[in-house]
Protein backbone atom coordinates (compact mmCIF):
# COMPACT_ATOMS: atom_id res chain seq x y z
CA UNK A 1 0.00 0.00 0.00
CA UNK A 2 2.89 2.31 0.84
CA UNK A 3 4.23 2.79 -2.70
CA UNK A 4 0.69 3.28 -4.01
CA UNK A 5 0.26 5.97 -1.36
CA UNK A 6 3.58 7.54 -2.38
CA UNK A 7 2.56 7.49 -6.04
CA UNK A 8 -0.83 9.04 -5.34
CA UNK A 9 0.89 11.87 -3.46
CA UNK A 10 3.28 12.63 -6.33
CA UNK A 11 1.44 11.84 -9.58
CA UNK A 12 -0.82 14.47 -11.11
CA UNK A 13 -4.13 13.82 -12.82
CA UNK A 14 -2.35 14.38 -16.11
CA UNK A 15 0.26 11.73 -15.18
CA UNK A 16 -2.46 9.22 -14.34
CA UNK A 17 -4.32 9.89 -17.60
CA UNK A 18 -1.09 9.38 -19.54
CA UNK A 19 -0.44 6.05 -17.80
CA UNK A 20 -4.05 4.92 -18.23
CA UNK A 21 -3.88 5.58 -21.97
CA UNK A 22 -0.70 3.57 -22.56
CA UNK A 23 -1.24 0.30 -24.44
CA UNK A 24 -0.25 -3.03 -22.89
CA UNK A 25 2.06 -3.56 -25.87
CA UNK A 26 3.00 -1.79 -29.06
CA UNK A 27 4.79 -2.58 -32.29
CA UNK A 28 7.66 -0.27 -33.19
CA UNK A 29 8.62 0.04 -36.84
CA UNK A 30 11.88 1.42 -38.23
CA UNK A 31 12.44 1.71 -41.96
CA UNK A 32 14.22 -1.31 -43.35
CA UNK A 33 14.47 -3.03 -39.95
CA UNK A 34 12.45 -5.90 -38.46
CA UNK A 35 9.50 -4.79 -36.33
CA UNK A 36 9.85 -4.85 -32.54
CA UNK A 37 7.08 -5.75 -30.08
CA UNK A 38 7.53 -3.72 -26.87
CA UNK A 39 5.78 -4.48 -23.59
CA UNK A 40 6.33 -4.35 -19.84
CA UNK A 41 5.33 -7.89 -18.89
CA UNK A 42 4.04 -9.76 -21.93
CA UNK A 43 2.29 -8.53 -25.08
CA UNK A 44 -1.06 -9.44 -23.51
CA UNK A 45 -0.63 -8.65 -19.80
CA UNK A 46 1.42 -6.06 -17.87
CA UNK A 47 2.04 -8.49 -15.00
CA UNK A 48 2.81 -11.65 -16.98
CA UNK A 49 6.42 -12.80 -17.10
CA UNK A 50 8.18 -14.07 -20.20
CA UNK A 51 10.78 -16.51 -18.90
CA UNK A 52 13.32 -18.61 -20.83
CA UNK A 53 12.18 -22.15 -21.55
CA UNK A 54 8.63 -21.78 -20.24
CA UNK A 55 6.03 -23.73 -22.22
CA UNK A 56 3.54 -20.89 -21.57
CA UNK A 57 5.53 -18.78 -24.03
CA UNK A 58 3.95 -20.69 -26.93
CA UNK A 59 0.53 -19.30 -26.01
CA UNK A 60 1.94 -15.86 -25.18
CA UNK A 61 3.63 -15.61 -28.58
CA UNK A 62 0.70 -17.04 -30.59
CA UNK A 63 -0.76 -13.68 -31.64
CA UNK A 64 2.53 -11.75 -31.84
CA UNK A 65 3.54 -10.88 -35.40
CA UNK A 66 7.04 -9.37 -34.87
CA UNK A 67 9.94 -11.77 -34.42
CA UNK A 68 11.53 -9.61 -31.69
CA UNK A 69 9.98 -8.93 -28.28
CA UNK A 70 11.42 -6.37 -25.85
CA UNK A 71 10.05 -6.85 -22.34
CA UNK A 72 10.80 -6.16 -18.69
CA UNK A 73 8.97 -6.90 -15.44
CA UNK A 74 11.29 -9.69 -14.20
CA UNK A 75 14.19 -7.33 -13.36
CA UNK A 76 16.50 -9.96 -14.90
CA UNK A 77 18.46 -9.79 -18.15
CA UNK A 78 17.24 -12.28 -20.75
CA UNK A 79 18.25 -13.11 -24.31
CA UNK A 80 16.64 -16.21 -25.78
CA UNK A 81 14.82 -17.55 -28.82
CA UNK A 82 11.82 -19.84 -28.46
CA UNK A 83 8.83 -20.69 -30.68
CA UNK A 84 10.24 -18.49 -33.44
CA UNK A 85 10.51 -15.35 -31.28
CA UNK A 86 13.62 -13.68 -29.89
CA UNK A 87 13.10 -12.13 -26.45
CA UNK A 88 15.30 -9.41 -25.00
CA UNK A 89 14.87 -8.20 -21.44
CA UNK A 90 17.14 -5.34 -20.40
CA UNK A 91 17.00 -6.17 -16.68
CA UNK A 92 16.57 -3.16 -14.41
CA UNK A 93 18.27 0.16 -13.88
CA UNK A 94 16.85 0.69 -10.38
CA UNK A 95 16.37 -2.70 -8.69
CA UNK A 96 18.07 -5.43 -10.71
CA UNK A 97 17.86 -8.98 -9.40
CA UNK A 98 21.46 -9.69 -10.36
CA UNK A 99 22.97 -9.46 -6.87
CA UNK A 100 25.63 -7.06 -8.18
CA UNK A 101 24.41 -3.53 -7.29
CA UNK A 102 24.79 -2.45 -10.91
CA UNK A 103 22.34 -0.69 -13.21
CA UNK A 104 21.35 -2.71 -16.27
CA UNK A 105 20.12 -1.60 -19.67
CA UNK A 106 20.50 -2.54 -23.31
CA UNK A 107 21.25 -0.83 -26.59
CA UNK A 108 19.87 -2.05 -29.91
CA UNK A 109 22.16 -1.55 -32.88
CA UNK A 110 21.10 -1.84 -36.51
CA UNK A 111 23.53 -3.78 -38.67
CA UNK A 112 22.89 -5.07 -42.18
CA UNK A 113 19.14 -4.55 -41.68
CA UNK A 114 19.13 -6.73 -38.56
CA UNK A 115 19.10 -5.95 -34.84
CA UNK A 116 22.10 -6.60 -32.62
CA UNK A 117 21.62 -6.33 -28.88
CA UNK A 118 24.23 -5.01 -26.45
CA UNK A 119 23.61 -5.56 -22.73
CA UNK A 120 25.26 -3.01 -20.45
CA UNK A 121 25.88 -3.00 -16.69
CA UNK A 122 27.16 0.11 -14.93
CA UNK A 123 28.34 0.96 -11.46
CA UNK A 124 26.56 3.88 -9.84
CA UNK A 125 26.36 5.54 -6.44
CA UNK A 126 23.99 3.19 -4.61
CA UNK A 127 24.45 4.95 -1.27
CA UNK A 128 23.36 8.25 -2.83
CA UNK A 129 20.16 6.59 -4.04
CA UNK A 130 19.48 5.10 -0.60
CA UNK A 131 20.15 8.49 1.00
CA UNK A 132 17.64 10.10 -1.36
CA UNK A 133 15.06 7.40 -0.53
CA UNK A 134 15.43 8.33 3.13
CA UNK A 135 15.26 12.08 2.40
CA UNK A 136 12.06 11.60 0.40
CA UNK A 137 10.51 9.72 3.36
CA UNK A 138 10.20 6.37 1.59
CA UNK A 139 10.71 4.60 4.93
CA UNK A 140 7.78 6.49 6.44
CA UNK A 141 5.44 6.01 3.47
CA UNK A 142 6.41 2.49 2.36
CA UNK A 143 8.77 1.03 4.98
CA UNK A 144 8.83 -2.60 3.88
CA UNK A 145 8.90 -1.99 0.12
CA UNK A 146 11.82 0.35 0.83
CA UNK A 147 13.56 -2.25 3.01
CA UNK A 148 13.41 -4.77 0.15
CA UNK A 149 14.60 -2.11 -2.32
CA UNK A 150 17.56 -1.15 -0.15
CA UNK A 151 18.83 -4.72 0.16
CA UNK A 152 18.49 -5.15 -3.63
CA UNK A 153 20.44 -1.95 -4.23
CA UNK A 154 23.19 -3.29 -1.97
CA UNK A 155 23.45 -6.56 -3.89
CA UNK A 156 20.75 -8.63 -2.21
CA UNK A 157 18.58 -11.07 -4.12
CA UNK A 158 15.23 -10.98 -2.29
CA UNK A 159 12.71 -9.66 -4.82
CA UNK A 160 9.72 -7.50 -3.99
CA UNK A 161 7.55 -10.35 -5.29
CA UNK A 162 8.99 -12.72 -2.68
CA UNK A 163 8.04 -10.37 0.13
CA UNK A 164 4.66 -9.64 -1.47
CA UNK A 165 3.79 -13.33 -1.80
CA UNK A 166 4.67 -14.04 1.83
CA UNK A 167 2.77 -10.95 3.05
CA UNK A 168 -0.29 -12.12 1.10
CA UNK A 169 -0.01 -15.62 2.60
CA UNK A 170 0.11 -14.13 6.09
CA UNK A 171 -2.83 -11.86 5.32
CA UNK A 172 -4.84 -14.84 4.03
CA UNK A 173 -4.05 -16.88 7.15
CA UNK A 174 -4.96 -14.05 9.52
CA UNK A 175 -8.03 -12.58 7.81
CA UNK A 176 -9.33 -15.42 5.64
CA UNK A 177 -8.83 -13.45 2.42
CA UNK A 178 -6.29 -11.13 0.87
CA UNK A 179 -6.75 -8.81 -2.07
CA UNK A 180 -3.83 -6.94 -3.54
CA UNK A 181 -3.00 -4.13 -2.90
CA UNK A 182 -4.91 -4.03 0.41
CA UNK A 183 -2.31 -5.91 2.45
CA UNK A 184 -1.99 -4.72 6.06
CA UNK A 185 1.40 -3.28 6.98
CA UNK A 186 1.64 -5.81 9.84
CA UNK A 187 1.70 -8.63 7.26
CA UNK A 188 4.44 -6.86 5.29
CA UNK A 189 6.39 -6.36 8.51
CA UNK A 190 6.15 -10.03 9.48
CA UNK A 191 7.03 -11.19 5.95
CA UNK A 192 10.15 -9.02 5.84
CA UNK A 193 11.17 -10.09 9.34
CA UNK A 194 10.94 -13.76 8.33
CA UNK A 195 12.69 -13.32 5.00
CA UNK A 196 15.59 -11.25 6.27
CA UNK A 197 16.05 -13.42 9.37
CA UNK A 198 16.45 -16.44 7.07
CA UNK A 199 19.16 -14.57 5.16
Functional labels for PLM-detected ranges:
Residues 67-68, 116:
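Short active-site oxyanion
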Residues 83-90, 94-199:
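Acidic, His/Gly-rich catalytic cores of divalent-metal-dependent hydrolytic chemistry
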Residues 1-28, 33-35, 45, 51-65:
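Active-site neighborhood of divalent metal-dependent phosphoester bond hydrolases
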Residues 22-25, 74, 92-95:
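Glycine-rich, charged/polar anion/phosphate-binding loops
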Residues 44-46, 70-81, 95-100:
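Active-site environment of divalent metal-dependent phosphoester hydrolases
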Residues 29, 39, 118-120:
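Beta-strand residues in well-ordered beta-sheet regions across diverse protein folds
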Residues 39, 68-75, 87-91:
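Active-site neighborhood of phospho(di)ester-bond hydrolases with catalytic His/Asp-centered motifs
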Residues 25-28, 77-81, 104-108:
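Short beta-strand scaffold segments in enzyme catalytic cores
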Amino acid sequence: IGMIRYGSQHLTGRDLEFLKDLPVSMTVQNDGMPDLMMCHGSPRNLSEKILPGHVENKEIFADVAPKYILCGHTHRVANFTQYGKTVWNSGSVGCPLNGKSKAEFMILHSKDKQWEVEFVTLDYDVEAVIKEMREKSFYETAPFWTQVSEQLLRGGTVAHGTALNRAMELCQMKYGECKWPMIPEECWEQACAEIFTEK
